Amino acid sequence: MNDQSCVRIMTEWDIVAARQLGRNVAKELGFGTVDQARITTAISELARNIYLYAGKGQIGIEQVADRGKKGLKIIAEDQGPGIPDIRKVMEDGFSTSGGLGAGLPGVKRLMDEFSLNSVAGEGTEIQAIKWLR
């Protein structure tokens, strides 16, 4: 099962579209309202980071399966400046935009799996999975 849909992130309205897509896919997979909220919050944080720090990128939403489990994978990709200090951005409360600093650590807490790959000057890819229970 690898059914992927993407939303290009270039405006704030694209963040809303990505959230809605994620909620629809989560609902279709059978996630309850609490997990739907977790997924849409994670998408919102990732899409907002693309918009604020990279200027443009995309959010992919993919249905995944592994050893009899079904889940939803979020893939956030951009070709922005990259993240110079990954350890720092994964600290609770860290923000360069004056936000709450819940961003990436919050996404990691909301989802079951989280990976981050960033190369200075080339961009960032973040993948996060929520498994259906």
UniProtKB/Swiss-Prot annotation:
Q: Which UniProt keywords apply?
A: ATP-binding, Kinase, Nucleotide-binding, Serine/threonine-protein kinase, Transferase
Effect seen on changing residue 78 to N: Loss of kinase activity towards RsbS. Loss of the ability to activate sigma-B in response to salt and ethanol stress while retaining the ability to respond to energy stress
**Entry-linked InterPro entries:** HATPase_C_sf
Q: What is its EC number?
A: 2.7.11.1
**Signal peptide stretch:** none
Q: Which residues form a coiled coil?
A: none
- Name the enzyme group at the top EC level: transferase
Query: What role does it play?
Result: Provides the crucial link between the upstream module (communication of environmental stress) and the downstream module (integration of the environmental signals with signals of energy stress) that compose the signal transduction pathway controlling the sigma-B factor. Phosphorylates and inactivates its specific antagonist protein RsbS thanks to its serine kinase activity. Upon phosphorylation of RsbS, RsbT is released to stimulate RsbU, a PP2C phosphatase, thereby initiating the signaling cascade that ultimately activates sigma-B.
| Full protein name | Serine/threonine-protein kinase RsbT
Native source organism of the sequence: Bacillus subtilis (strain 168)
The taxonomic lineage of its organism, from the top, reads:
Bacteria, Bacillati, Bacillota, Bacilli, Bacillales
Gene symbol?
Answer: rsbT
